[in-house]
Regions:
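Short amphipathic alpha-helix
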Residues: 17-31, 188
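Conserved catalytic-core segment of nucleotide-activated headgroup transferases in glycan assembly
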Residues: 155-224
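Nucleotide-activated donor-dependent transferases that construct or modify glycoconjugates
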Residues: 1-14, 40, 236
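Extended catalytic core of nucleotide-activated donor transferases of GT-like folds
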Residues: 46-122, 126-133
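A short, glycine/small-residue-rich beta-strand->loop->alpha-helix junction that serves as a flexible
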Residues: 6-22, 180-181
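A short beta-strand-loop structural module common to alpha/beta enzyme folds
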Residues: 7, 31-47, 198-204
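Donor nucleotide-sugar binding/catalytic pocket of nucleotide-sugar-dependent glycosyltransferases
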Residues: 122-136, 140-158
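Nucleotide-sugar-dependent
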Residues: 224-245
Length: 245
């Protein structure tokens, strides 16, 4: 039995989604998995990227054979069901690693549509038990494994320290900063006026903030550089509309 993963074209590498996916490709390669498609590329042109990824998907037809296992990362946009069908046509098995569910993130899929799509996989690797329970509640019946913590690969080391009683308490947030995506950030004035937030990312709408002294906007910083330079008591990972959810 040979184990594979499927690479693709990533139009940009300096965002959280693609960083996570390319890290997984690197980890799988180090574990002895082979790339069933074309080599990883980073063309920003959408047409070029589409053609390269499609060619990589079609190459799977000639790469794998019966009883081979292929790891596919989800979402894989328009290719996911197609590539799963190709693998099963060759009598192989599909393991899917979930990064995001369209039902929640983009809301372009209903739960029923997403479950139907993911049912093409033989095994799912999901974030945690909450996601597993949700999948089961929506009718998913295939085996699932919980990944739990999802970390980055990075050669960077952070040697910054903070004393527990050092004031003000500093919190780092890195991610989408626009009001539409993370409305809760703009409500933190009401509950955390004695803390200080350092924000890394793009499209921060400073004009919507009541007390601008609560935030320090640092702009976008590549992930390895961010790991090396941040200095705070806590890091916050959250996306949402409300401070109450």
């Amino acid at each position: 039995m040979t184990q594979y993963y499927l690479s693709k074209n990533y139009n940009v590498l300096n965002n959280a989604g693609n960083k996570a996916k390319t890290d997984i490709e690197e980890i799988l390669s180090k574990l002895g998995y082979k790339n069933a498609g074309l080599p990883q590329t980073t063309y920003s042109n959408k047409i070029t990227g589409f053609l390269i990824t499609l060619a990589g998907v079609l190459k799977v037809l000639f790469t794998i054979s019966a009883n081979n296992v292929v790891v596919v990362q989800y979402p894989f946009k328009k290719y996911y069901s197609f590539v799963c069908n190709i693998i099963h046509l060759k009598r192989g098995k599909v393991i899917t690693i979930i990064h995001d569910l369209g039902t929640f993130r983009s809301k372009k899929l209903t739960a029923e549509q997403e479950i139907k799509r993911l049912s093409h996989s033989d095994v799912l690797i999901v974030h945690n038990n909450r996601m597993k329970e949700w999948m089961e509640s929506q009718g998913y019946t295939q085996p699932m494994v919980c990944l739990e913590i999802f970390d980055y690969l990075s050669p960077s080391v952070n040697n910054n320290t903070h004393e527990p009683n050092q004031k003000p308490i500093k919190v780092i947030y890195a991610g989408a900063l626009n009001y539409r995506k993370n409305k809760y950030l703009y409500s933190l004035n009401d509950v955390m006026s004695k803390w200080q937030f350092e924000l890394y990312g793009k499209r921060f709408e400073e004009d919507k903030i009541k007390d601008k002294t609560l935030f320090k906007f640092k702009g976008f910083v590549p992930s390895d550089q961010l790991i090396e330079q941040v200095s705070a008591h806590f890091g916050l990972i959250w996306e949402g509309d409300s401070i109450h959810t």
